[in-house]
């Protein structure tokens, strides 16, 4: 191939590379130029050059993508999951009970859990609604520690107290 034809082939190849890497639509490629170049070239050196460049790379892109897909599908997924909810819950109280508050809305494995911000209801109250808020907004207890409440539903009759620093 003459130097001028080689330079033209390189420009055509560069044009295809740029359009491909820019994710252009196939109709924007210069197909007529490629067809004309292949017809004009007696021994199809452009096509041979493309094939040689393709054969020089020993792996196909599709093979690599397939291997990554297999690795992704074979990876073991964790069975643990976390969900966050913003709830409004009502805490049932006996008239002798002296606390109420707001609970955080974090629900692990079907139970309600959150940080309690203690407040004091009216002595005559038998039920007091408490709004849930994200744990980052829950207040500190009077002793400076956060109180973690674990209950089975949104109307707790019992709670397990755990202290967090």
Swiss-Prot record:
Keywords: Methyltransferase, S-adenosyl-L-methionine, Transferase. One of its GO terms (molecular function) is methyltransferase activity. Its EC number is 2.1.1.-. It is an enzyme of class 2 (transferase). Transmembrane segments: none annotated. Signal peptide: none annotated. Pfam families: FAM86. GO terms for biological process: methylation. GO terms for cellular component: protein-containing complex. The keyword Methyltransferase applies. Interacts with EEF2KMT. Belongs to the class I-like SAM-binding methyltransferase superfamily. EEF2KMT family. This is Putative protein FAM86C1P.
